[in-house]
């Protein structure tokens, strides 16, 4: 039986964790001689009161939705997929190969092909450590971490030695054909008469693919027989095996779905924004996905809201670095505080609340 009401665990605990993180961040900003109120005002104005700010925030949000959902699926099977960075890198390679070597007549077909390529490559890359866990007993955390480094090497090899145009000094693939370029929010807004909206912002049509992924994962986890088996294995391995769930099958499937979602992040960054394959395009989104999944309690709605928050922090941090004396490193610290309190230290918030609700139940008895 749950000690706390569900709404307390889903809403109150994350909000209190955010408040503690914001309080410590305010103290740090004060310590370097800046005003926390001014900093917050700049973040809000630069992100929420300008359409371009919204465009950048939703661009980052798209990445975090994909990686947050990926980690959530693995969490439901009691697996810790810390290899999102590597799976996204390999997914980017899949996007590049599909866009460069398949003659697509229109972006509507190209995004389907790129999504399938990204998902397939990410799925395969996640399937390797999943097999080692399911069949050989290797710890999924260790293997996925190591596969991040291997993926980085694979990406460098393909970008520098295979896909880079002859004579180019830029470590990047050739530009994708124009028929594969995804419409940005600025393109969409201009069609309905708002030419100046989302100016120069990289947010693109892949945001709606991420929203569709939220709906699909919700249905998978809570409305399908496969989702029931994933949750059963995550809740109790022995009980799930007794009920007929095959752990090897579920571990493989859950991790491959997780890898596919991480790989699909590349349609936003590689096909949608840079329109070519570059190094370091993931920008840590695979690791941020862990915090997004933790804060969102591994539910697609929570993941979406947490991804929005981290998108706000990323774009707001860029505004602070531009308009204040707050160094970029301090902005990373502020983001780390949010991750720390919503993830690792959430028990510090949850424990007093559990004691409070336990005392209420005892009083009722």
Predicted regions and their residues:
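Single transmembrane alpha-helix segments in multi-pass membrane proteins
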Residues: 27-32, 42, 47-102, 115-138, ...
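Interfacial/capping segments of alpha-helical transmembrane domains
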Residues: 26-47, 164-176
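Transmembrane alpha-helical segments in multi-pass inner-membrane proteins
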Residues: 256-336
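Cytosolic-side transmembrane-helix boundaries in multi-pass membrane proteins
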Residues: 1-18, 26, 235, 242-249, ...
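Hydrophobic core segments of alpha-helical transmembrane domains in multi-pass membrane transport
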Residues: 14-30, 67-71, 92, 96-98, ...
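Short loop segments and helix-boundary regions at transmembrane helix junctions
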Residues: 2-12, 75-84, 106-180, 223, ...
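Transmembrane helix-bundle core of multi-pass membrane transporters
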Residues: 51, 144, 148-221, 362-364
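Helix-loop-helix "hairpin" substructures at the membrane interface of multi-pass membrane proteins
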Residues: 189-193, 198-276, 300-301, 305
């Amino acid at each position: 039986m749950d000690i706390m009401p569900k709404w307390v665990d889903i809403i109150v605990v994350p909000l209190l964790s955010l408040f503690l993180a914001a309080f410590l961040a305010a103290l740090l900003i004060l310590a370097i001689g800046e005003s926390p109120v001014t900093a917050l005002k700049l973040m809000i104005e630069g992100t929420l009161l300008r359409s371009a700010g919204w465009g950048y925030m939703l661009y980052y949000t798209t990445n975090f939705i994909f990686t947050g959902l990926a980690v959530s699926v693995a969490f439901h099977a009691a697996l810790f997929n810390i290899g999102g960075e590597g799976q996204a890198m390999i997914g980017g390679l899949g996007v590049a190969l599909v866009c460069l070597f398949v003659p697509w007549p229109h972006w509507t077909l190209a995004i389907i092909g790129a999504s399938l390529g990204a998902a397939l490559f990410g799925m395969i890359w996640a399937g390797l450590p999943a097999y080692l866990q399911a069949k050989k007993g290797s710890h999924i955390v260790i293997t996925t971490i190591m596969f991040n480094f291997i993926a980085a090497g694979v990406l460098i090899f393909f970008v520098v030695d295979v896909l880079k145009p002859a004579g180019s000094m830029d470590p990047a693939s050739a530009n994708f054909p124009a028929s594969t370029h995804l419409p940005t929010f600025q393109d969409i807004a201009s069609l309905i008469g708002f030419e100046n909206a989302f100016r120069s912002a990289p947010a693109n049509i892949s945001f709606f693919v991420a929203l569709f992924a939220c709906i699909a994962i919700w249905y998978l986890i809570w409305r399908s027989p496969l989702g029931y088996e994933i949750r059963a294995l995550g809740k109790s391995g022995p009980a799930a095996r007794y009920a007929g769930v095959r752990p090897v099958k579920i571990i493989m499937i859950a991790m491959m779905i997780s890898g596919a979602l991480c790989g699909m992040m590349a349609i936003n960054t590689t096909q949608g924004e840079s329109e070519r394959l570059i190094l370091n395009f993931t920008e840590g989104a695979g690791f941020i996905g862990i915090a997004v999944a933790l804060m969102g309690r591994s539910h697609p709605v929570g993941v979406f809201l947490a991804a929005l928050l981290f998108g706000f922090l990323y774009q707001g941090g860029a505004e602070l670095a531009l308009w204040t004396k707050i160094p970029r490193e301090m902005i990373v610290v502020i983001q780390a505080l949010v991750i720390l309190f919503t993830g690792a230290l959430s028990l510090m918030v949850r424990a007093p609340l559990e004691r409070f609700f336990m005392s209420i139940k005892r009083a009722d008895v």
